[in-house]
Each structure stands twice: as C-alpha cells, then as structure tokens.
Design a protein with these regions (language model features):
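Sec/Tat signal peptide C-region and signal peptidase I cleavage site
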Residues: 18-24
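Bacterial N-terminal signal peptides
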Residues: 8-17
Length: 425
C-alpha cells in the first residue's frame, strides 16, 4: 500500500529555528533602535549614563554639528528629540576654509541632583580646500568640561581642564563620587614639550559648580606615551585609573590606585601577565564583591585576528585576585575594544567588537561571575548583522537594566550612526 508523504513534517523542517536566550545570557529587550535623528553627517563615539530616576542619556559626536544627546525612559522610549549639547564652530567667514573647532570624544556622568557633567576633546583644525578636496591639519587638542541641568541645558560656560596646552590633550573620562569632588582623567601627547608632557593627567571638579578645584596632576610616571585612560571608583571614595603604555618591547596595560583625597596609593603597576604582543584599550569597573576592580583589555599577539579580550581582578589594595582570565572565547575572529560594567548579583557584563579579516562584523557580550567564569553563552548584541558595527559602551540602570549603544550602519544608511539595544540580566 502506498502511503502519502508526510508533507507536514517537511514543512516543519523548513521553519526557522528560534532559540531563546540560555540561562545566564544577557536577555535582549526588543531589537536595536536608532538613536540619532540627524543623518546629514557621520555620528561617532557614543556613551550612555543613567540618572538616579532610571532615565538614560546617550551622548555622541556628529562630525559636522558637534556633541549631541538624547534622553530615554527606563523602558527605552525616547523622552526628547535629539539635543544639541555643544556645537562645532567655524572661526572664519570664508566658506569651507579657515579654522574649525571640533568637539569629539564625549564622556558623561550624572550627579545625584540629576544634573550631569560632560567632558570632551576640543580640536582646532586648519581647513583648506584645493579644487574639490578638503584638507585638514590639526592645530591643537584640549580637554573641556561643562555642567548641564537635568533637561540638558548648559549651566555656565565650558572650562578647559588641561593647564599644559602644548601637544594634544584628549580622551577624557569622568568619575562622579559620593561626598567628594568628581575626577576627570585624560591623555596628553606632549611631543612638542618632550617626554615629560606625555602621560595620563587628572583634575578634580566641583559637582556643585562644574569648576576645577585642584591643579592639573600627572598620574603616570613611566616615561613615554600613555594612552586610553579608564577610571572607576571604590565604595570608600577612592578610585583606580588604568591606561596602556609602552612596556619594554611591547605595549602593556597599567593601573594605579588613589585615595579619596586623590593622593596616590603607591606606584603604577603592570596588570597584564601576558607580555608578548600589544595589550591595549583597558576598560575598568568597580567590584563590589571585594572592594576592588575588574580590568579588561584587548590582548593582541600578532595581527588583529590574533586579538582576544582578557581580564584581571584586582583587590582593594591592588593585589591580583586569581590569574589573568580570557573573557572572549571566539577563535575564528579577533575580539577588540572591550567595555565592562558591574551588574546585579556581583556579576559583570563585558562587550567587545568581533573582527573577521580586518573587517568589523558584530558586537558580542558575555556575563561573567565574580571569579571570571562565563554565566551562559556569548550573545550577539546587534540585530542588523550585515553591516559594520563598532565603538560600544555599557550603561547600567539603578534597577539593573542595561543599555548598550554603539556606532554603526543600518541597512538603509551609508554613513555611520548611533544605535542601541536594551538588555536584562
């Protein structure tokens, strides 16, 4: 007897397989969404922060219009249109030529009042046009800071933080502390004034006024260029600062601890135990389990395809807790540019960018426990997977939700914009 084909089984086999997040994985809340409304230019370097009420602010740079921002509710709904925070400036009446002031590399931190501090790199470019080709030469870079109210309105004028103006000052980071002045750190490339001008510098800022309360202080002591600073606080008001610097024949990741008064607690020390290749782009977060910190970085032994994300737990006194750990587990692609944040349950979320044949292909993240072990599998953050994504950061809300913004392309745009996605842990 002939039997009919089991067509329904065939159809079932053709259905897409939809997998739920594994236990311990970051759980996405909806798909990625576009943050920037202005698409006339390129958008870069997003950073996000939550206020005490649970609203988020995403800030980024528009290479034509300056620093932009947008507020979101705790549920991810936009609370405002795109805001212009600090505009670029043309210092000449000659069209397409002259000196242009570019605001870039934003850093943002909320105060207890709901106001926030915004720091940035201010770059002056000498712009000229030859036929239809624009030429730019960087004149200088400085670090500025300004206070804003809870609605995003500027409070007072911007203030330059660096006292040393020779060379390039850039890449600020901000730490707001309870019961103490805020700390702003940045890197200085002081090649015009010799090696003493290179390094990581800081200045304390009054949360009430947004004005500096101390002189500029150099934090790094090893001669040579130090770059890409990161900062995270401790429960006692102290803090740690990390950066990358030349370490013999390679590049290493260093850290230094500071008391609540901002006085150093000992000298800087190398964190990475793997010394071959380039160890770069440190990211730092406080560890409530020990009163110390978790430091992650990009470790590269050869080409970018040999890069992975590594980490090291530090105790409250700077001692190593356990050995260096490998956070990212991909083998076919390089993992670079990590970000890290402490989340609920004493765990941590680490994100990074995956590369394949020198092309960025996606953003990934993993939750790890207090010992550095993965809690669940790695998860892809972006949903539009056919275009390049880069420059991710992490913000954690008071209720434990996570917002991850990044710079990248959508399927319908040819210039990079700012996207974001919400997660629960």
């Amino acid at each position: 007897m002939r039997t009919k084909p089991l067509l329904w089984l065939t159809a079932l086999a053709l259905l897409p397989v939809v997998s739920a997040p594994l236990a311990g994985q970051p759980r996405p809340v909806g798909s990625e969404f576009r943050v920037n409304a202005n698409t006339e230019s390129k958008q870069h370097n997003p950073i996000a922060a939550f206020n005490a009420a649970g609203s988020a602010l995403v800030v980024w740079e528009n290479d034509k219009n300056g620093l932009r921002g947008r507020f979101y509710s705790r549920d991810g709904a936009p609370l405002t249109a795109e805001l212009g925070l600090v505009a670029n400036q043309k210092l000449t009446s000659v069209p397409a030529a002259g000196v242009e002031v570019i605001r870039k590399d934003p850093a943002v931190a909320f105060l207890a009042s709901g106001d926030f501090l915004l720091a940035w790199t201010e770059e002056r470019d000498d712009v000229s046009v030859d036929i239809f080709i624009e030429h730019r030469a960087v004149i200088d870079r400085d670090v500025y800071l300004q206070k804003f109210n809870a609605a995003g309105a500027a409070q007072g004028a911007p203030v330059r933080l660096n006292a040393t103006t020779a060379g390039y000052q850039s890449l600020p980071k901000i730490l707001v502390r309870n019961g103490a002045d805020a700390v702003v750190v940045w890197q200085s490339d002081g090649r015009r004034v010799g090696p003493s001008g290179d390094g990581i510098f800081s200045r304390l800022v009054s949360p009430a006024t947004g004005q500096p309360t101390t002189v500029e202080t150099k934090l790094s002591s090893v001669p040579g260029l130090a770059a890409n600073p990161a900062i995270a606080g401790a429960a006692n008001g102290g803090f740690a600062v990390a950066w990358e610097a030349v370490d013999g024949s390679s590049q290493g990741v260093f850290a230094r601890l500071f008391a609540k008064s901002a006085a150093p607690r000992g000298a800087e020390f190398r964190v990475n135990s793997t010394v071959q290749g380039l160890q770069r782009r440190p990211a730092l977060t406080a560890d409530a389990n020990t009163g110390g910190w978790l430091l992650v970085w990009q470790g590269q032994a050869g080409s970018i395809k040999d890069s992975h994300v590594y980490g090291q737990f530090l105790g409250a006194g700077g001692s190593f807790i356990g050995p260096q750990i490998r956070v990212s587990q991909g083998v076919a692609q390089g993992q670079v540019s990590p970000s890290v944040a402490a989340v609920a349950g004493g765990h941590f979320l680490v994100t990074w960018l995956d590369y394949h044949d020198i092309f960025p292909v996606g953003l990934f993240g993993v939750e790890i426990d207090k010992l550095g072990a993965a809690v669940g599998a790695e998860v892809e953050i972006n949903t539009e997977a056919i275009n390049a994504h880069t420059r991710t950061s992490i913000a954690v809300s008071p209720s434990g939700g996570v917002l991850v913004p990044w710079e990248g392309f959508t399927n319908s745009q040819v210039a990079p914009g700012i996207s974001a996605r919400r997660f629960e842990l």
